[in-house]
């Protein structure tokens, strides 16, 4: 039975196996009530503004995390293509920060006055722990893939046919829900699967725990944005 499970994992990839295993939590992160409220057009403006301001702070903390993953790829990866994928993602973060500033201005948010809420601090703390030289590349790239994929899956749901996403939020949803970003997430997933296929049992355990931690932090971040913390 165990050999059959291992064969399936090899065929479909470890990340797919884990998402299947932890589907309830994954759905909680990608189909959160906040996302559903965007999709059906009932979102509270205050919730969106809270998310926007807090996510700006998160992205600023995300930059050094991605830089650390790039360094780990340089040191530990057996494929030079990894660095190119990660570097491409890192380069897009400058534009992302500019977008947040423009969007905040549009919504009347003074970003210099924004203070990180506890859920945000906790999530940024997780990123910081992954920046340690002791954190394995396999674990860090699994987290990176999961973080990006939750946003892609969530916001893609808001621009699917039949959605009633408010026009003023369409740009936000397209930013992460578009097909190109989906392909980028697929590239990260391919890297993660390759690393996990060669990982030790201990690394696999750490990576799975990290995936669960990312999903839990994503749910808490959405909860924070809705005000129910």
Swiss-Prot record:
GO molecular function: thiaminase activity
Name this protein carries in UniProt: Probable bifunctional TENA-E protein
Disulfide bonds: 158-173
GO biological process: one example: thiamine biosynthetic process
A Pfam family annotated for this UniProt entry: TENA_THI-4
Catalytic activity: 4-amino-5-aminomethyl-2-methylpyrimidine + H2O = 4-amino-5-hydroxymethyl-2-methylpyrimidine + NH4(+); N-formyl-4-amino-5-aminomethyl-2-methylpyrimidine + H2O = 4-amino-5-aminomethyl-2-methylpyrimidine + formate
EC assignment: 3.5.1.-, 3.5.99.2
GO cellular-component term (any): cytosol
Reported function: May be involved in thiamine salvage.
Main enzyme class: hydrolase
Pathway it works in: Cofactor biosynthesis; thiamine diphosphate biosynthesis
Superkingdom of source: Eukaryota
Family the UniProt entry places it in: Belongs to the thiaminase-2 family.
Gene that produces this protein: TENA_E
Key words of the record: Disulfide bond, Hydrolase, Thiamine biosynthesis
Record keyword Disulfide bond present: yes
